[in-house]
Amino acid sequence: ASASPSPPRLFPLVLCSPSDSVYTVGCAAFDFQPSSIAFTWFDSNNSSVSGMDVIPKVISGPPYRAVSRIQMNQSEGKEKQPFRCRAAHPRGNVEVSVMNPGPIPTPNGIPLFVTMHPPSREDFEGPFRNASILCQTRGRRRPTEVTWYKNGSPVAAAATTATTVGPEVVAESRISVTESEWDTGATFSCVVEGEMRNTSKRMECGLEPVVQQDIAIRVITPSFVDIFISKSATLTCRVSNMVNADGLEVSWWKEKGGKLETALGKRVLQSNGLYTVDGVATVCASEWDGGDGYVCKVNHPDLLFPMEEKMRKTKASNARPPSVYVFPPPTEQLNGNQRLSVTCMAQGFNPPHLFVRWMRNGEPLPQSQSVTSAPMAENPENESYVAYSVLGVGAEEWGAGNVYTCLVGHEALPLQLAQKSVDRASGKASAVNVSLVLADSAAACY
């Protein structure tokens, strides 16, 4: 159900750390509906203030939130404060007075500087999913009073501690905040002897714009090599751009059948500070190869409606197996003691999915000893692809007459596997029994 129409709740905002040259104040509007809102600013002489901006235009909803700020020269701001922020809304207009007093004067003229330090994303990675917000003062005395507020309502904080650092007294007051409180955008305020500092995730210090991104889902098809080895197909549904993974539900379904057992992976932190989680289910390779359809269904508290994404194997209209060629090291490499290159080429195949493995005398070699290219379009007109793999071989190993075999797996090959071998003596293909190479990894699917 949609939120009921309501006017905004307005709160003053100031910088976490005062600037010596730029005067900045702001105001935050919370919980209004509908989203239409307009800010205006007035100075102490009731004159309209220009240079206002809104960050961003409107934040999420419903209900909605928005932030407005003004900036000017420090001396001009001090002269014209306090300022009034007015928010015009269809459900009523509200005002709040705000000023940035800067350093707090004391009876003996010694200033007290107040700063606020929000938690980092890493602070929430502990087992209890909580962190702390720090309000710190520096000066030649301890503050007489520190109070905390959450969205304008008083909250309890830990006792203020103080230490002496040279001529300064550094006092610290902390409040505990859960990851859920921080992620939902709650505003926390620290008031030191009448001076306020604010912080929240969505309005860091009341100034930083927040890049809003919608939750997205993407289905990832199983790889051919995994299907070949395990005889099963892994269906992956990737949910990204989540502020919090709490309440996430991911389920895989057969398009013509029931629900599949779905496992949720660990959440992964994205570069933008949001989270990604994979939902994974497994089906038989025969079902996947047969063209069965599957549906990923996602629900999350931040989604207005559940999301769905379908997936099935795309049949190649012009499927062709690769021709496999193996080449010995070039003559130029044989003249020294450098490492040699044995090359395998898979040519003319479609679809562009295959794997390459190397063996020496019938024994598998580590994949770290070779470099394999991604399939490249050889002839776009008839959907033909080519791929190369280069195996590094020691000069002594090659000279000892070892046989090197290139195994190529592709769905259009007989038994989905082809091989070609080469050695120093013949340079011709050698027969190698590869039926047992992958047998230990093979698994039946029922």
Swiss-Prot record:
SUPFAM superfamilies: Immunoglobulin (SSF48726). The keyword RNA-binding does not apply. Residues 317-427 are annotated as: CH4. Residues 1-105 are annotated as: CH1. Residues 210-316 are annotated as: CH3. Residues 428-446 are annotated as: C-terminal region. SMART domains: IGc1. InterPro entries: CD80_C2-set, Ig-like_dom, Ig-like_dom_sf, Ig-like_fold, Ig/MHC_CS, Ig_C1-set, Immune_Resp_Modulators, Immunoglobulin_dom. Gene3D superfamilies: Immunoglobulins. One of its GO terms (biological process) is antibacterial humoral response. Glycans are attached at residues 45-46, 73, 130, 198, 382, 433. GO terms for molecular function: antigen binding; immunoglobulin receptor binding. Residues 106-209 are annotated as: CH2. The keyword Cell wall biogenesis/degradation does not apply. GO terms for cellular component: extracellular region; immunoglobulin complex, circulating. Disulfide bonds join 27-85, 135-190, 237-296, 344-406. Keywords: Disulfide bond, Glycoprotein, Immunoglobulin domain. Signal peptide: none annotated. This is Ig mu chain C region.
